[in-house]
Amino acid sequence: ALVPVAMIGADLPGGVHIKKGKLRGVESNGMLCSLGELGLTKHDFPYAIEDGIFLIEEDCKPGQDIHEAIGLDDTSVEFEITSNRPDCLSVVGLAREAAVTFGKPLNLKAPEFHGSEDKLSDSLAVAVENTQLCPRYIAGMVKNVKIGPSPRWMRERLRASGVRPINNLVDITNYVMLEYGQPMHAFDQRYVKDGKIVVRNAKDGEAITTLDGQERQLSPEMLIIADAEKPIAVAGVMGGEYSGIMDDTNTVIFESAYFEPVQVRRTAKKLGMRTDASARYEKGLDPDGCQRTLKRAMELVELLGAGEPVAEFIEVDNRTAKPAEIPFDPDWINRFLGTEISREEMVKTLESLDIQVKGDVCVSPSFRIDLERPADIAEEVARIYGYNNIPSTVIRGVAEAQLTPQQQFLRKAEQTMVGLGYYGTLTYSFTSPKCFDRIGLPADSKLRKTITITNPLGEDTSIMRTTTLPCMLDVLATNYKNRNAAVALYEIGKEYLPTGPDTLPNEPNRLTIGMYGGDADFFALKGAVEALLKELRLPKCTYVRPSEAEGVFEECCALHPGRSAVILSGETPIGYLGELHPTVQKTYGIGTRTYVAKLLVQEMAEMAEAEVTYRPLPKFPAITRDLSLLCDDALPVGKMEEAIEQAAGKLLEEVTLFAVY
């Protein structure tokens, strides 16, 4: 027998550097190596002695490089497969792509095996309780199993793919997974109680010791493979240690199934397990490939003489999904890609990828779960046509982006408020349910019907706001606590008004104004609002007491009843303004009179005059008239202004209240 020898200057995997020396007085010019010193294990070479010198039983010559002698000189090509192409996580998938890329035919031989005529249903039963998480399950059986090492060619291919050879039966399942991309599992029939396989959800308190020797607690949302009594595998992740293949196994049950990808990923993540099987299942596999994979495993069993396959399979098939049908429009694809590819060439390309073209529809093959929309079809055409063959096109000039009318209106409102001396502020769109109590909102108010946040940062940010007033008061209170003597603020933000349990809320924009200190009073706030409305070109507005527009703005309960008003444009309420109620003011800890307003920006934008009507300058100078009136204290100024305007007609330009005495 020949043995591996490391000559002077060689570096071994363990970090050992071979140099000339003396061993027991004898000059040493190298070292005979064991498996461990070469970084190999008995699984790689089952016939070798674990601790002694490695005796090479392969066909080799003296002086031959050890890599070549034991089959480690093969070239490995590493592919980085993106998560949207699980069909390429296999040799067959890559061969399919290579055949199309190089324009060669793909000659895939359908697996065949003879098998015994034994009736499998007499010794095995399969039941799938959760057909949503396992729409397809196929079981096959191999009798008179002969456990032993796999042939050299299989071991070398497994090693080159990063898989450790174990024994012929386990190696076959791994080999088929690498070849077809479909994970398989093998059970020892002796440990499948009553010959019954049940695919079900785990029960509370159940546990399983997996093949890695770890005991893992299961939860009801996890899908498992069980026998009549206990779990024997975690579906799509790893098998159980108890039912695994052993040296004295006589009968094996092969499993080939399709498990729902999201469920496999959640289970693997919760158990802290990442296996080759789960990595494939969680990306989505070809449900049509289960039977082909199982047949290939049986073919290899016969080829290696590892046992006697049973020809009959037991299959549970509850698939309801149909192949995706995607619109096919060659003209759109050419416009999308900037190409001039003929329909015939596109059809030829797509059919070479097993994508059927039926008129104006493409039918996706079962293994291409990434094909969903026309852009995906265009991508297939482009990558086979060659990205470097797509001509460069000059970017076409496009019109400069313009603000929408709504954005222009909001921008103008902001600019006007800044021009009036107000500072902009920005608050969170979520708030606390307690804010309604702080402004004295009635318990049955519709504003208390809010959208609850599923994962809030805390109780103070647990709902979406239905009114912007509390947010403005929070900012004013913060400024007051920080000893800002005079503050004038505005905010343009959204309110979130629920529309139904399964629909998105309405999100109207609101302009909220808040001020205190300095020259702040009701009339200063009213003057700012009037200046804003005039700049935004709203029709003549009037003011009424909140009691005359009851129920329109429920937040008016937070205002002083005698120093507040609802703003009307025509007959339409567009906002309110007034002094904060002393009780609310005290609740927020503000020690001075505070004034607030809220305007319905969205409604105002719809009512604003879109066009400015030109009027020539008057030929005659304006005449100012002072009118002194004696009237009841309860008479609103708006009523007097309305009477004057009606009496004066078109000649009147403006009415202004300038003194009360």
Language-model regions: role of each:
Residues 1, 155-156, 167, 173-242:
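Conserved mixed alpha/beta core segments that line enzyme active sites in large multi-domain catalysts
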Residues 1-118, 272, 276, 280, ...:
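Phosphate-backbone binding interfaces of nucleic-acid-interacting proteins
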Residues 36-37, 43-45, 54-56, 147, ...:
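Conserved catalytic alpha/beta cores of large enzymes that bind or transform nucleotide phosphates
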Residues 74-82, 135-143, 276-283, 320-337, ...:
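Short, hydrophobic beta-strand segments
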Residues 98-129, 305-333, 337-340, 377:
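Terminal amphipathic helices with adjacent charged low-complexity linkers/tails
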Residues 103-115, 165-172, 301-316, 358-359, ...:
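Flexible, glycine/charged-enriched surface loops at secondary-structure junctions
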Residues 326-485, 661:
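Extended, well-folded interaction surfaces typified by the phenylalanyl-tRNA synthetase beta subunit core
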Residues 352-355, 499-507, 512, 519-661:
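A carboxyl-terminal module marker
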